[in-house]
Amino acid sequence: MITRSDFDKLLRNQQYEELKSYKVENAVILAAGLSKRFLPISEYCPKGLTKVKGEILIERQIRQLQEAGIKEIYVVVGYKKELFFYLKDKFNVIIVENNEYDTKDNIESLNLVKKILGNTYICSVDNYYIDNPFRLYEYKGYYSSIYVEGYTDEWCINTDNTGTIQSVNIGGHDADIMMGYVYFDRVFSKQFKALLSKIPDDSEYWHQVWEYLYIHNLDKLHLEIKRHEPELILEFDSVNDVIKFDKSFLKNN
Protein backbone atom coordinates (compact mmCIF):
# COMPACT_ATOMS: atom_id res chain seq x y z
CA MET A 1 0.00 0.00 0.00
CA ILE A 2 1.34 3.42 -0.94
CA THR A 3 1.48 6.28 1.54
CA ARG A 4 -1.30 8.84 1.69
CA SER A 5 1.03 11.57 0.44
CA ASP A 6 1.98 9.41 -2.55
CA PHE A 7 -1.70 8.75 -3.20
CA ASP A 8 -2.48 12.47 -3.12
CA LYS A 9 0.44 13.23 -5.43
CA LEU A 10 -0.61 10.58 -7.97
CA LEU A 11 -4.16 11.90 -7.86
CA ARG A 12 -3.03 15.51 -8.39
CA ASN A 13 -0.89 14.40 -11.34
CA GLN A 14 -3.77 12.33 -12.76
CA GLN A 15 -1.65 9.17 -12.80
CA TYR A 16 -4.71 6.96 -12.69
CA GLU A 17 -2.97 3.79 -13.88
CA GLU A 18 -1.06 3.80 -10.60
CA LEU A 19 -4.30 4.17 -8.65
CA LYS A 20 -6.33 1.27 -10.06
CA SER A 21 -6.67 -0.50 -6.72
CA TYR A 22 -7.98 2.72 -5.13
CA LYS A 23 -10.74 3.31 -7.67
CA VAL A 24 -14.29 3.34 -6.34
CA GLU A 25 -16.13 0.42 -7.94
CA ASN A 26 -19.73 1.10 -7.05
CA ALA A 27 -22.21 2.64 -4.63
CA VAL A 28 -25.19 1.39 -2.65
CA ILE A 29 -28.07 3.68 -1.71
CA LEU A 30 -30.18 2.35 1.18
CA ALA A 31 -33.80 3.31 0.48
CA ALA A 32 -35.91 0.43 1.80
CA GLY A 33 -37.11 1.81 5.12
CA LEU A 34 -40.59 2.82 6.25
CA SER A 35 -39.50 6.32 7.34
CA LYS A 36 -41.92 6.28 10.27
CA ARG A 37 -40.58 9.58 11.58
CA PHE A 38 -41.45 11.17 8.23
CA LEU A 39 -45.20 10.90 8.69
CA PRO A 40 -47.63 11.98 7.31
CA ILE A 41 -45.68 12.42 4.04
CA SER A 42 -44.28 8.88 4.09
CA GLU A 43 -47.79 7.39 4.14
CA TYR A 44 -48.01 8.06 0.40
CA CYS A 45 -44.45 8.94 -0.64
CA PRO A 46 -41.17 7.36 0.56
CA LYS A 47 -38.74 9.89 1.97
CA GLY A 48 -36.24 9.40 -0.85
CA LEU A 49 -38.81 10.44 -3.46
CA THR A 50 -39.79 13.70 -1.82
CA LYS A 51 -38.74 16.93 -3.48
CA VAL A 52 -36.29 19.19 -1.62
CA LYS A 53 -35.28 22.56 -3.08
CA GLY A 54 -36.73 21.48 -6.42
CA GLU A 55 -34.92 18.11 -6.62
CA ILE A 56 -36.08 14.61 -5.75
CA LEU A 57 -33.85 13.56 -2.86
CA ILE A 58 -32.59 10.24 -4.24
CA GLU A 59 -32.17 11.65 -7.75
CA ARG A 60 -29.85 14.36 -6.42
CA GLN A 61 -27.66 11.74 -4.74
CA ILE A 62 -27.58 9.53 -7.86
CA ARG A 63 -26.54 12.52 -9.98
CA GLN A 64 -23.77 13.42 -7.56
CA LEU A 65 -22.41 9.87 -7.68
CA GLN A 66 -22.57 9.77 -11.47
CA GLU A 67 -20.93 13.18 -11.79
CA ALA A 68 -18.05 11.80 -9.72
CA GLY A 69 -17.66 9.00 -12.26
CA ILE A 70 -19.39 6.21 -10.34
CA LYS A 71 -21.63 4.43 -12.82
CA GLU A 72 -22.51 1.20 -10.99
CA ILE A 73 -25.14 2.21 -8.46
CA TYR A 74 -27.38 -0.17 -6.52
CA VAL A 75 -30.59 1.15 -4.95
CA VAL A 76 -32.05 -1.14 -2.28
CA VAL A 77 -35.81 -0.60 -2.03
CA GLY A 78 -38.59 -2.04 0.10
CA TYR A 79 -41.42 0.20 1.29
CA LYS A 80 -43.51 1.28 -1.73
CA LYS A 81 -40.75 -0.21 -3.86
CA GLU A 82 -42.62 0.12 -7.15
CA LEU A 83 -42.39 3.91 -6.91
CA PHE A 84 -38.59 3.64 -7.27
CA PHE A 85 -38.59 1.40 -10.34
CA TYR A 86 -38.48 4.35 -12.78
CA LEU A 87 -34.93 5.07 -11.59
CA LYS A 88 -33.68 2.03 -13.49
CA ASP A 89 -34.56 3.55 -16.86
CA LYS A 90 -33.91 7.17 -15.96
CA PHE A 91 -30.46 6.69 -14.39
CA ASN A 92 -29.47 3.13 -15.35
CA VAL A 93 -29.21 2.10 -11.70
CA ILE A 94 -29.68 -1.45 -10.42
CA ILE A 95 -32.75 -1.97 -8.25
CA VAL A 96 -32.48 -4.53 -5.45
CA GLU A 97 -35.68 -5.50 -3.63
CA ASN A 98 -35.63 -6.00 0.13
CA ASN A 99 -38.87 -7.79 0.91
CA GLU A 100 -38.10 -7.96 4.63
CA TYR A 101 -37.82 -4.20 5.11
CA ASP A 102 -40.63 -4.21 7.69
CA THR A 103 -39.16 -6.98 9.87
CA LYS A 104 -35.40 -6.42 9.54
CA ASP A 105 -33.25 -3.30 9.65
CA ASN A 106 -30.88 -2.01 6.97
CA ILE A 107 -28.28 -4.69 7.68
CA GLU A 108 -30.51 -6.96 5.58
CA SER A 109 -30.20 -4.49 2.70
CA LEU A 110 -26.41 -4.81 2.86
CA ASN A 111 -26.75 -8.57 3.12
CA LEU A 112 -28.64 -8.56 -0.19
CA VAL A 113 -25.80 -6.75 -1.98
CA LYS A 114 -22.86 -8.31 -0.13
CA LYS A 115 -21.48 -9.95 -3.28
CA ILE A 116 -20.76 -6.57 -4.86
CA LEU A 117 -19.19 -4.91 -1.81
CA GLY A 118 -15.61 -3.92 -2.54
CA ASN A 119 -14.47 -0.33 -2.94
CA THR A 120 -18.01 0.81 -2.27
CA TYR A 121 -19.82 3.94 -1.12
CA ILE A 122 -22.67 3.18 1.30
CA CYS A 123 -25.24 5.96 1.17
CA SER A 124 -28.48 6.68 2.99
CA VAL A 125 -31.43 8.10 1.11
CA ASP A 126 -32.15 10.68 3.83
CA ASN A 127 -28.92 12.65 3.43
CA TYR A 128 -28.56 15.85 1.43
CA TYR A 129 -25.10 17.06 0.44
CA ILE A 130 -24.74 20.77 -0.31
CA ASP A 131 -21.59 20.09 -2.34
CA ASN A 132 -20.77 16.83 -4.09
CA PRO A 133 -18.62 14.83 -1.60
CA PHE A 134 -17.95 11.84 -3.86
CA ARG A 135 -14.87 11.15 -5.94
CA LEU A 136 -13.60 8.33 -8.13
CA TYR A 137 -10.52 7.44 -6.05
CA GLU A 138 -10.30 6.96 -2.30
CA TYR A 139 -7.28 6.10 -0.19
CA LYS A 140 -8.89 4.15 2.65
CA GLY A 141 -12.24 3.21 4.18
CA TYR A 142 -13.89 5.88 6.32
CA TYR A 143 -17.07 7.06 8.02
CA SER A 144 -18.17 10.64 7.40
CA SER A 145 -18.52 12.89 10.41
CA ILE A 146 -19.41 16.37 11.57
CA TYR A 147 -18.52 18.06 14.86
CA VAL A 148 -21.32 18.93 17.27
CA GLU A 149 -20.93 21.34 20.18
CA GLY A 150 -22.72 20.61 23.44
CA TYR A 151 -24.81 17.53 24.14
CA THR A 152 -25.83 15.16 21.35
CA ASP A 153 -27.69 11.84 21.35
CA GLU A 154 -26.00 10.86 18.07
CA TRP A 155 -23.27 8.23 17.69
CA CYS A 156 -20.00 9.80 18.83
CA ILE A 157 -16.65 8.79 17.35
CA ASN A 158 -13.35 8.44 19.19
CA THR A 159 -10.16 8.06 17.16
CA ASP A 160 -6.47 7.50 17.67
CA ASN A 161 -3.87 10.00 16.47
CA THR A 162 -3.97 8.55 12.93
CA GLY A 163 -7.70 9.18 12.59
CA THR A 164 -8.66 5.51 12.86
CA ILE A 165 -11.93 4.97 14.73
CA GLN A 166 -11.28 3.25 18.06
CA SER A 167 -14.69 3.40 19.72
CA VAL A 168 -18.22 4.67 19.18
CA ASN A 169 -20.54 5.83 21.97
CA ILE A 170 -24.21 6.68 21.67
CA GLY A 171 -24.56 10.16 23.14
CA GLY A 172 -21.87 12.58 24.25
CA HIS A 173 -20.67 16.17 24.49
CA ASP A 174 -18.62 18.27 22.05
CA ALA A 175 -18.03 15.33 19.75
CA ASP A 176 -17.44 14.13 16.21
CA ILE A 177 -20.60 12.26 15.25
CA MET A 178 -21.40 9.75 12.52
CA MET A 179 -23.16 11.63 9.75
CA GLY A 180 -23.54 10.88 6.07
CA TYR A 181 -22.07 8.38 3.66
CA VAL A 182 -19.50 5.68 4.39
CA TYR A 183 -16.71 4.33 2.22
CA PHE A 184 -15.87 0.62 2.41
CA ASP A 185 -12.50 -0.28 0.91
CA ARG A 186 -11.84 -3.86 -0.21
CA VAL A 187 -10.14 -4.85 3.03
CA PHE A 188 -13.07 -3.62 5.11
CA SER A 189 -15.62 -5.21 2.77
CA LYS A 190 -13.93 -8.60 2.97
CA GLN A 191 -14.00 -8.59 6.77
CA PHE A 192 -17.54 -7.19 6.90
CA LYS A 193 -18.89 -9.85 4.53
CA ALA A 194 -17.22 -12.59 6.58
CA LEU A 195 -18.92 -11.35 9.75
CA LEU A 196 -22.24 -10.87 7.96
CA SER A 197 -22.25 -14.45 6.74
CA LYS A 198 -21.84 -15.75 10.30
CA ILE A 199 -24.87 -13.97 11.80
CA PRO A 200 -27.45 -16.56 12.93
CA ASP A 201 -30.98 -16.25 11.55
CA ASP A 202 -32.37 -15.48 15.00
CA SER A 203 -29.74 -12.86 15.87
CA GLU A 204 -30.75 -9.42 17.14
CA TYR A 205 -28.33 -7.95 14.61
CA TRP A 206 -31.01 -8.33 11.90
CA HIS A 207 -33.15 -5.86 13.83
CA GLN A 208 -30.44 -3.21 14.16
CA VAL A 209 -28.77 -0.82 11.76
CA TRP A 210 -25.60 -2.29 10.23
CA GLU A 211 -23.41 -0.02 12.32
CA TYR A 212 -24.05 -2.20 15.38
CA LEU A 213 -22.15 -5.04 13.71
CA TYR A 214 -19.39 -2.55 12.95
CA ILE A 215 -19.02 -1.05 16.43
CA HIS A 216 -19.03 -4.49 18.06
CA ASN A 217 -16.15 -5.60 15.84
CA LEU A 218 -13.83 -2.60 15.76
CA ASP A 219 -10.85 -4.89 16.28
CA LYS A 220 -11.51 -6.41 12.85
CA LEU A 221 -13.31 -3.62 11.00
CA HIS A 222 -11.12 -0.57 10.49
CA LEU A 223 -12.41 2.77 9.24
CA GLU A 224 -10.97 6.25 9.49
CA ILE A 225 -12.94 9.37 10.29
CA LYS A 226 -13.62 11.80 7.45
CA ARG A 227 -14.55 15.17 8.87
CA HIS A 228 -16.88 17.54 7.01
CA GLU A 229 -18.08 21.04 7.78
CA PRO A 230 -21.42 20.70 9.65
CA GLU A 231 -23.35 22.81 7.15
CA LEU A 232 -22.38 20.58 4.21
CA ILE A 233 -24.14 17.36 5.31
CA LEU A 234 -27.84 17.43 6.16
CA GLU A 235 -29.90 14.53 7.49
CA PHE A 236 -33.67 14.67 7.25
CA ASP A 237 -35.08 12.50 10.03
CA SER A 238 -38.41 14.29 10.21
CA VAL A 239 -40.59 16.60 8.13
CA ASN A 240 -39.64 19.47 10.45
CA ASP A 241 -35.95 18.86 9.66
CA VAL A 242 -36.66 19.43 5.96
CA ILE A 243 -38.88 22.46 6.50
CA LYS A 244 -36.02 24.20 8.34
CA PHE A 245 -33.99 23.85 5.13
CA ASP A 246 -36.74 24.16 2.52
CA LYS A 247 -39.69 26.37 3.54
CA SER A 248 -41.65 25.24 0.47
CA PHE A 249 -41.33 21.53 1.24
CA LEU A 250 -44.96 20.89 2.21
CA LYS A 251 -46.27 22.87 -0.75
CA ASN A 252 -44.13 20.84 -3.17
CA ASN A 253 -44.93 17.45 -1.67
Regions found by a protein language model. Name each.
Residues 85-155:
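Conserved beta-loop-beta/alpha segment of the NTase-like Rossmann-fold superfamily
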Residues 130-204:
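Conserved core of the sugar-phosphate nucleotidyltransferase
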Residues 215-227:
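Catalytic donor-sugar/metal-binding loop of nucleotide-sugar-dependent glycosyltransferases
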Residues 3-43, 222:
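N-terminal nucleotide-binding beta1-loop-alpha1 segment
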